[in-house]
């Protein structure tokens, strides 16, 4: 309220000391909202306000620095109780006021400048405190995020190591039936390249399939040999050798049969 009163007075009457104040000399004529100037701390205005004396010294820049404000605060605080309340006696307060100047022609008073400066400083201080609070909160959040990242780092590293380690996949083995297994393991390199080759033992299923094929055809083509080798899980060489041995056996059986038949026919000849 006090700052509003001073600023409005300075805007209407720029020449404060030259104008005789009216209706302010008698304490009874003052309303309740204007308190005693002696009870108000003059240092709060920051520019040497003493009572109602509005004679102030303008600085070159129009604003007051922190050093001038501090000095004026000390001077105002020491001189406030010693000086009288008003510079003019109460008998001269009824003189007619001069014509007010337009507000556009009035230069900004240092009181208003200091008042706005105080508002700006308060706004800046509140903004700085808000920025500091947000910075503190963001820093705490950053610390929390960093700690969370540090906690997640071991878990992620463990997952990465678990993923990087190849899981032991079972080796893909072909399905082997009992008739596909060999009864005797052949050792080709035991006796060297010129050593005796181990005999191959065929299963019943393999022997049966080979006998059926030999019954239909005693000689195999290359294509049919490959098909039988894949079907019986044997090599082409094994199929070829088996068919050779089977033909030799067949010839021997036929020769013995023909010889027996010839011998039997000669015996029954009359």
Curated annotation (Swiss-Prot):
Residue ranges of the annotated DNA-binding region, renumbered to this chain: 195-254
Please tell me whether the keyword Membrane is annotated for this protein. no
Among InterPro entries, the record links this protein to: Antp_homeobox, HD, HD_metazoa, Homeobox_antennapedia, Homeobox_Antennapedia_CS, Homeobox_CS, Homeodomain-like_sf
| SUPFAM superfamilies the UniProt entry points to | Homeodomain-like
Annotated region (Disordered) at 75-175
Question: Is the keyword Transcription assigned to this protein?
Answer: yes
Q: What SMART domains does the record point to? A: HOX
**Entry's Gene Ontology molecular function annotations:** DNA-binding transcription factor activity, RNA polymerase II-specific; RNA polymerase II cis-regulatory region sequence-specific DNA binding
- Keyword vocabulary terms for this entry: Developmental protein, DNA-binding, Homeobox, Nucleus, Transcription, Transcription regulation
Q: Name one GO cellular component term.
A: nucleus
Entry's localization field = Nucleus
The record's annotation in PANTHER family points to: HOMEOBOX PROTEIN HOX, HOMEOBOX PROTEIN HOX-A5
Q: Describe its partners and assembly state.
A: Forms a DNA-binding heterodimer with transcription factor PBX1.
Q: What protein am I looking at?
A: Homeobox protein Hox-A5
Q: Give the species this sequence originates from.
A: Bos taurus
């Amino acid at each position: 309220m006090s700052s509003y009163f001073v600023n409005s007075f300075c805007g209407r009457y720029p020449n404060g000391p030259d104008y005789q104040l009216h209706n302010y000399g008698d304490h009874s004529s003052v309303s309740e909202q204007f308190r005693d100037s002696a009870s108000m701390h003059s240092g709060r205005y920051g520019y040497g306000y003493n009572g109602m004396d509005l004679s102030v010294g303008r600085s070159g820049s129009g604003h007051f620095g922190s050093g001038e404000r501090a000095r004026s605060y000390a001077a105002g605080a020491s001189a406030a109780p010693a000086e009288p309340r008003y510079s003019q006696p109460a008998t001269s307060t009824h003189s007619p006021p001069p014509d007010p100047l337009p507000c556009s022609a009035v230069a900004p008073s240092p009181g208003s400048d200091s008042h706005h400066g105080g508002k700006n400083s308060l706004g800046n201080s509140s903004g700085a405190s808000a920025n500091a609070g947000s910075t503190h909160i963001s820093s705490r959040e950053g610390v929390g995020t960093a700690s969370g990242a540090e906690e997640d780092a071991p878990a992620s590293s463990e997952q990465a190591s678990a993923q990087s380690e190849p899981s032991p996949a079972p080796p893909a083995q072909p399905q082997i039936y009992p008739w596909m297994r060999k009864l005797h393991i052949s050792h080709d390199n035991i006796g060297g390249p010129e050593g005796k080759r181990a005999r191959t033992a065929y299963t019943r299923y393999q022997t049966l399939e080979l006998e059926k094929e030999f019954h239909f055809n005693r000689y195999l083509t290359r294509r049919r040999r490959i098909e039988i080798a894949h079907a019986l899980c044997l090599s082409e060489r094994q199929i070829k050798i088996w068919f050779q041995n089977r033909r030799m056996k067949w010839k021997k059986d036929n020769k013995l049969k023909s010889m027996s038949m010839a011998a039997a026919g000669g015996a029954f000849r009359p």
